[in-house]
């Protein structure tokens, strides 16, 4: 009799994905973030489900219902704090996961990479509509400002914005539909994650060297299950530290004030994980140009496999490209800082310089560095 996990139609799929999966023997802790993202998604869906049981998507009661969850529901404060800070953990893991893909050339698995970029966009959309739900000042004005950007689309822009709003301003209809979107999108993300893994398991994982690892594979279980559990413990520790000791440190104080359409907050800014894109949006003094730059800042990831010029896959043995990669990382941190600053000098010019460098490094300098490194590695005979 064959082992059940190898013969049962359902268990067999799990076995080939998480137990007997051949994995490269040398993948580092940077490969932990995929499983951490899976755990983050499960945490967000479960805490979100319990929050949705008590939340009301009506402009008059939304803010009060969130207060009610925190005050009157058993462990409601904990569920809410884990959900709010879980989003931050999700994005921390996402950015590190994408960074790993860029550094080690994982983007050459084109289908996996493209599904990953679609996943990133979907998670960003989910976080945006979710941020509107507590109906605080920053929720309301964030929704107003960001949805208003669509009015920059020629001819159909204004109609499109009013269609999304369900009226002539962000109001009850907007809140209700955003709640509906926020509920359905995580399940769409779940489906996309399965497709992401499906394509990944067609090729197998990349590894730090970027060399074909087929000659040296080990089973996923027990080696990488144990390794993933270590990463999981550390992430849960960080998440609980955030949620229990300083749950509001990453939020905006303005969101403790109920939404008021007649009073604009002094500085409208999104959550920290959108600040880099917000800085790029603001660095262009033209509405349509800003929107296009905002889109390009994420969609440029789709072009990265086409911009790969090096004969080597990974950056592990490419010091010039490595330097550019860390410059890009520093640049993104500068953009994140600028996104949270008021629109005045010197922040305007710093933001514009950082936005230009962001696109220059990715589109021009990285491909050139790859070509230069190829040339430098060519044997030179006397």
UniProtKB/Swiss-Prot annotation:
Binding site for a ubiquinone: 201
Membrane topology: Multi-pass membrane protein
Details of cofactor binding: Binds 2 heme b groups non-covalently.
Keyword Flavoprotein: no
GO molecular function: metal ion binding; ubiquinol-cytochrome-c reductase activity
Places the protein is found: Mitochondrion inner membrane
Gene Ontology BP, a term: mitochondrial electron transport, ubiquinol to cytochrome c
Record-listed heme b b562 binding positions: 83, 182
Cofactor(s), by name: heme b
Amino acids binding heme b b566: 97, 196
InterPro entries given in the database record: Cyt_b/b6_C, Cyt_b/b6_C_sf, Cyt_b/b6_N, Cytb/b6-like_sf, Cytochrome_b, Cytochrome_b_C_euk/bac, Cytochrome_b_N_euk/bac, Di-haem_cyt_TM
Transmembrane intervals: 33-53, 77-98, 113-133, 178-198, 226-246, 288-308, 320-340, 347-367
Principal location: mitochondrion
Keywords associated with the record: Electron transport, Heme, Iron, Membrane, Metal-binding, Mitochondrion, Mitochondrion inner membrane, Respiratory chain, Transmembrane, Transmembrane helix, Transport, Ubiquinone
Gene Ontology CC terms, in alphabetical order: mitochondrial inner membrane; respiratory chain complex III
Anything else known: Heme 1 (or BL or b562) is low-potential and absorbs at about 562 nm, and heme 2 (or BH or b566) is high-potential and absorbs at about 566 nm.
Function as written in the Swiss-Prot or TrEMBL entry: Component of the ubiquinol-cytochrome c reductase complex (complex III or cytochrome b-c1 complex) that is part of the mitochondrial respiratory chain. The b-c1 complex mediates electron transfer from ubiquinol to cytochrome c. Contributes to the generation of a proton gradient across the mitochondrial membrane that is then used for ATP synthesis.
Oligomer and partners: The cytochrome bc1 complex contains 11 subunits: 3 respiratory subunits (MT-CYB, CYC1 and UQCRFS1), 2 core proteins (UQCRC1 and UQCRC2) and 6 low-molecular weight proteins (UQCRH/QCR6, UQCRB/QCR7, UQCRQ/QCR8, UQCR10/QCR9, UQCR11/QCR10 and a cleavage product of UQCRFS1). This cytochrome bc1 complex then forms a dimer.
PANTHER family, A to Z: CYTOCHROME B (PTHR19271:SF16)
Family, similarity comment: Belongs to the cytochrome b family.
Protein name: Cytochrome b
């Amino acid at each position: 009799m064959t082992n059940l996990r190898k013969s049962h139609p359902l268990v067999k799929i799990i076995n080939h994905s998480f137990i007997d999966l051949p994995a490269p023997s040398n993948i580092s802790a940077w490969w932990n973030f995929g499983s951490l993202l899976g755990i983050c998604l499960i945490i967000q869906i479960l805490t979100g489900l319990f929050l949705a049981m008590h939340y009301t998507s009506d402009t008059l009661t939304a803010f009060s219902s969130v207060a009610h969850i925190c005050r009157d529901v058993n462990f409601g404060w904990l569920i809410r704090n884990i959900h709010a800070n879980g989003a931050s953990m999700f994005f921390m893991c996402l950015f590190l996961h994408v960074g790993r893909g860029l550094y080690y050339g994982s983007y050459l698995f084109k289908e996996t990479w493209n599904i990953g970029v679609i996943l990133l966009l979907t998670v960003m959309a989910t976080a945006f509509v979710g941020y509107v739900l507590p109906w605080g000042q920053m929720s309301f004005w964030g929704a107003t400002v960001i949805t208003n950007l669509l009015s920059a689309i020629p001819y159909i822009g204004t109609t499109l914005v009013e269609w999304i709003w369900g009226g002539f301003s962000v109001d009850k209809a907007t809140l209700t539909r955003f709640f509906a979107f926020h509920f359905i999108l995580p399940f769409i993300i779940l489906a996309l994650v399965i497709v992401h893994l499906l394509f990944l398991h067609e090729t197998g994982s990349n590894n730090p060297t970027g060399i074909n690892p087929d000659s040296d594979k080990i089973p996923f279980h027990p080696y990488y299950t144990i390794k993933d559990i270590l990463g999981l413990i550390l992430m849960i520790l960080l998440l609980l530290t955030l949620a229990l000791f300083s749950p509001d440190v990453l939020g905006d104080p303005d969101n403790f004030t109920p939404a008021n359409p007649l009073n604009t907050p002094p500085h409208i800014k999104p959550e920290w994980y959108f600040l880099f894109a917000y800085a790029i949006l603001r660095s262009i003094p033209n509405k349509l140009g800003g929107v296009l730059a905002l889109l390009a800042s994420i969609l440029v990831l789709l072009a990265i496999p086409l911009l790969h010029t090096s004969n080597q896959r990974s950056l592990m043995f490419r010091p010039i490209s490595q330097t550019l990669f860390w410059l890009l990382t520093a640049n993104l941190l500068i953009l994140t800082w600028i996104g949270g600053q008021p629109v005045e000098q010197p922040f305007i010019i710093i933001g514009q310089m950082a936005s230009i460098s962001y696109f220059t490094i990715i589109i021009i300098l990285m491909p050139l560095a790859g070509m230069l490194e190829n040339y430098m590695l060519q044997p030179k005979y006397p």
